[in-house]
Regions:
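A short, proline-enriched helix->beta-strand linker immediately N-terminal to the Walker B motif
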Residues: 191-195
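Conserved ABC transporter NBD signature motif
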Residues: 87-99
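Conserved ABC ATPase signature
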Residues: 172-176, 180
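P-loop NTP-binding/switch modules centered on Walker-like glycine-rich loops
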Residues: 66, 80, 202, 206, ...
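Short catalytic/signature loops enriched in Gly
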Residues: 4, 13-27, 44, 257-355
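Q-loop/switch helix immediately C-terminal to the Walker
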Residues: 121, 129-141
């Protein structure tokens, strides 16, 4: 297809089905065409729109995007933690062969030990009246685990995060720092023996030095326990360091997905490159120069036609307004939803052919 304004050829059909083949049938978690809509003040707001991905056992998938991109909503939808009132969830979420949407409340409780979530602000998810050792063992208590086994598993979970029952005994959440509270939250998730943990901005509210410690801790625990992680963040640099694969979200849709190295070194989508503009780097040659293209405020209740990023995109052409791009295979292994994707490496990156 040729864009009338530019004269460039736009391949809108090639590789559109390749992404379906990219999704794995043997994944631990399979998400297909997930959509979430909220009704607010008589209007429908689309938070997530047709998102598909999967997570293999022991894999970390990063979800990255600006505030309002839908990443946290996806995490909560996977665990059925969204409010039922004025919320509509469509699509298919399958965990270990079970359709999560079809599970009754009792069946969902039965698999909750396998699917856990760590929140950005751990203190708000703690009961301030309870002692920390009871908070860590709360899930085990709900499962009816005997006290002796419960204490043993609490000890193991605390040890995995660099703490001990002696350290927390008799103390409550407000007596610990933010980093310690996040470690306690991780221990609480680990105690029930999960196979997949959704980490929702787990380091966003922490100091940089503490962030590195928590990220390294999650990496060590993942390898030790063969855990699958979904790591949600607005910071592409953080996501890249912790993830096997990265999905970039914009206005509720995945615009690029692939390995961290492919996306960081060869960002194909203009929005991915814009996210990289915000990453501080010591080497000035590595910095992507911000675009001077003016941006417009976008409505979640009435998104623009065609490509949703086109009103902020320096490469937008006429076809971008008339036809929505689909995720298609890029030369370096990732998939991107763009009519005019970048092919050049990010500034400062020396590719294999240049070495």
């Amino acid at each position: 297809m040729k864009d009338e304004a530019s004269g460039q050829t736009v391949d809108t059909g090639a590789a559109t089905h390749a992404f379906d083949a990219f999704l794995r049938d043997d994944a631990l978690l399979k998400v297909r065409d997930l959509s979430v809509r909220y009704r607010r003040g008589g209007k429908i707001f689309v938070a997530v729109d047709g998102v598909s991905f999967d997570v293999a056992p022991g894999e970390t998938l990063g979800l990255v995007g600006e505030s309002g991109s839908g990443k946290t909503t996806i995490g909560r939808a996977l665990l059925k933690l969204l409010p039922k009132a004025d919320t509509r969830v469509d699509g298919h979420v399958e965990y270990d062969g079970l359709n999560v949407a079809d599970l009754s409340a009792s069946d969902l409780r039965a698999i909750r030990s396998k699917l856990q979530m760590i929140f950005q602000d751990p203190i708000s998810s703690f009961n301030p009246r309870r002692k920390v050792q009871d908070i860590v063992g709360e899930g085990l208590e709900i499962q009816g685990i005997r006290k002796a086994e419960r204490l043993e598993r609490v000890d193991r979970a605390l040890n995995d995060v660099g703490m001990s029952r002696t350290m927390v005994e008799g103390r409550r959440p407000h007596q610990f720092s933010g980093g310690q509270c996040q470690r306690i939250a991780i221990a609480r998730a680990l105690a029930v023996g999960p196979e997949l943990i959704v980490c929702d901005e787990p380091v966003a509210s922490l100091d940089v030095s503490v962030q590195a410690h928590v990220i390294n801790l999650l990496q060590d625990i993942r390898q030790k326990r063969n855990l699958a992680l979904i790591f949600i963040s607005h910071d592409l640099a953080v996501v890249r360091n912790v993830s096997d694969r990265v999905a970039v979200l914009y206005m509720g849709r995945i615009v690029e997905i692939g390995t961290g190295d492919a996306i960081y070194q060869r960002p194909a989508h203009p929005y991915t490159r814009m996210l990289l503009e915000a990453v501080p780097v010591p080497d000035a040659s590595r910095k992507i120069v911000p675009s001077a293209t003016p941006t417009q405020a976008l409505s979640r209740s009435a998104p623009p036609s065609g490509c949703r990023f086109r009103l902020r995109c320096p490469r937008a052409q006429a076809v971008c307004a008339g036809e929505e791009p689909k995720l298609a295979s890029m030369p370096y292994g990732q998939f991107a939803a763009c009519h005019f994707p970048h092919d050049e490496p990010a500034p400062g990156i020396k590719t294999a052919e240049q070495a």
